[in-house]
From Swiss-Prot:
It comes from Streptococcus pneumoniae (strain ATCC 700669 / Spain 23F-1). Keywords: Methylation, Ribonucleoprotein, Ribosomal protein, RNA-binding, rRNA-binding, tRNA-binding. Belongs to the universal ribosomal protein uS12 family. GO terms for biological process: translation. GO terms for cellular component: small ribosomal subunit. The lineage of its organism: Bacteria, Bacillati, Bacillota, Bacilli, Lactobacillales. InterPro entries: NA-bd_OB-fold, Ribosomal_uS12, Ribosomal_uS12_bac. PANTHER family: 30S RIBOSOMAL PROTEIN S12 FAMILY MEMBER (PTHR11652). This is Small ribosomal subunit protein uS12. PROSITE patterns: RIBOSOMAL_S12 (PS00055). The keyword tRNA-binding applies. Part of the 30S ribosomal subunit. Contacts proteins S8 and S17. May interact with IF1 in the 30S initiation complex.
Length: 137
């Protein structure tokens, strides 16, 4: 336990919280070609690679992912949620934060139903998360 005098000389440091989705906290000024620290909830980007990835132990699957170059010139790996997708190279996508527990290095999700990404077909429940319109009665 420090004495009062020690705390006066050198106060306690508060913990610095690290961002879980750092690429969303960086903006880009294209006129000055300089990065700014303007954060945003989502970012637009262009898919540079679309493929599948195997998850960590003990899970087994082929998880769909896309490598995306964001509008702030940062390149990140993003997960494509839902069954089936229409993404290919040069597709324009919208990214949100949120990591995938069993895919190392994947810290972002692609928003379904926004920009070039189509919603999930034949989805009846939880449609808003997958960009699916309400089915006709």
């Amino acid at each position: 336990m420090p004495t009062i005098n020690q705390l006066v000389r050198k106060p306690r440091k508060s913990k610095v919280e690290k961002s879980k989705s750092p690429a969303l906290n960086v903006g880009y000024n294209s006129h000055k070609k300089v990065q700014t620290n303007v954060s945003s909830p989502q970012k637009r980007g262009v898919a540079t690679r679309v493929g599948t990835m195997t998850p960590r132990k003990p899970n087994s699957a082929l998880r769909k992912f896309a490598r995306v170059r964001l509008s702030n010139l940062i390149e990140v790996t993003a997960y494509i949620p839902g069954i089936g997708h229409n993404l290919q190279e040069h597709s324009v996508v919208l990214l949100r934060g949120g990591h995938v527990k069993d895919l190392p290095g994947v810290r972002y999700h692609i928003v379904r139903g926004a920009l070039d990404t189509a919603g999930v077909n034949d989805r009846k429940q939880g449609r808003s998360k997958y960009g699916t319109k309400r089915p006709k009665a």
